[in-house]
Curated annotation (Swiss-Prot):
It is a lipid-anchor. This is Outer-membrane lipoprotein LolB. Belongs to the LolB family. One of its GO terms (biological process) is protein transport. Plays a critical role in the incorporation of lipoproteins in the outer membrane after they are released by the LolA protein. The gene is lolB.
Length: 207
């Protein structure tokens, strides 16, 4: 059905106790140059991944609402991905399936919506302005369209600063999962003014 402007999916409120599960510690130590060959190689290794999936904890905190959910993210091809949000009880709150030119979202009532812009759809239906188009790169440890960023001492992203559509996002990476090759982000925090988005990845499967 067409995407309405007024409908909001009501996710369960965020319990105060879960905030620590998504805490982010800024990496210490000197950073590396974005022009380094090691950083270029790391980016290329990540971009060469054809398929990947991760699951973990999601928190959104603002003056208007606090939301906690479990998430599952699966990329099956270029611009083909699936995002699933479940509440702490394990029930599905929303499922989003995207492919070039078409995005479908099913809410917690089983209602189906279609659009050509996943980021706009998520924002209208949940009230959370998640920068999904950029997050698809950031969650992999890639800067996307951002040109203002810093690396850690292992030639991986540690911070991103990015402005678009009136939003000024700062992304801080708290660590990487070195059990995968290439190493993938283990947790991250996005902030824009009074809004915070926290992601903690439990594990990665990459191909």
């Amino acid at each position: 059905m067409p995407l309405p402007d007024f409908r909001l999916i009501r996710l369960l409120p965020l319990a105060a106790l879960v905030l620590t599960a998504c805490s982010v510690t800024t990496p210490k130590g000197p950073g590396k140059s974005p022009d380094s060959p090691q950083w270029r190689q790391h980016q290329q290794d990540v971009r060469n991944l054809n398929q990947y999936q991760t699951r973990g904890s999601f928190a959104y905190i603002s003056d208007q609402q606090k939301v906690y959910a479990r998430f599952f993210w699966q990329q099956t091809g270029q611009d083909r991905y699936r995002l699933l949000l479940t509440n702490p009880l394990g029930s599905t709150e929303l499922e989003l399936n995207a492919q070039p030119g078409n995005v479908q979202l099913v809410d917690n009532k089983g209602q189906r919506y279609t659009s050509d812009d996943a980021e706009e759809m998520i924002g209208k239906l949940t009230g959370m302005p998640i920068p999904l188009n950029s997050l698809r790169q950031w969650i992999l440890g890639l800067p996307g369209d951002a040109t203002d960023y810093k690396l850690d001492d292992q030639y991986r992203l540690s911070e991103i600063t990015y402005s678009q559509n009136g939003k000024n996002w700062k992304v801080v990476y708290g660590g990487y999962d070195t059990k995968t090759q290439p190493a993938m982000p283990a947790n991250m925090e996005l902030t824009d003014g009074g809004q915070r988005i926290k992601l903690k990845m439990d594990n990665w499967i990459v191909k």
